[in-house]
Amino acid sequence: LNRFIDQVYFNMVKIPAGKVELRDDRIKKEWQVQIKPFLLAKYVLTVELFYSITNRALNGNENSNKPVVNISWNDAIMFCNLLSKKAGLKEYYSVSNSGQIVSCNLDLNGYRLPSEAEWQYACKAGTPGYTYGELQKIAWYNENSNGQIRDVGKKEPNA
């Protein structure tokens, strides 16, 4: 287990403070968000890491370097809390007994999901506009993956 906790810690990337332009095309609105520095995992969550922390196999597989897919937002925040607990950090999310009410403990140091603004800012990696690089080089999608989920870390970073 410690190997996985260390793997998470050492694969975090420090994202510097800055500003990001967000937009909602449905309501034709744009706005700017100030971003504080934060840490973001270098890779998306893998099936192997998810299993090592939760002891829950996805699709009968526990040793895969493929990304976790088809889990709920609640599953994701429960993973963050469990990872925090196992790493000796304070849980970022508080969840009611019913699971219906979630609050964020902004002053705590636990693992969490990035906000929409943080995610956009990190994806842009200092580039202007809404394109992040040559798609073929930085992402798997239907045309270049043969419709298969691929291992993480096999494409160029977007920065």
What does each model-identified segment do?
Residues 62, 73-159:
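Functional-site microenvironments in short loops/helix caps that host divalent-cation chemistry
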Residues 1-4, 58, 93, 153:
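N-terminal intrinsically disordered, low-complexity tails enriched in polar/charged
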Residues 4-59, 67-84, 122:
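A short glycine-rich, aromatic-capped structural motif
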Residues 1-8, 99-102:
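A short, compositionally biased domain-edge/stem linker segment
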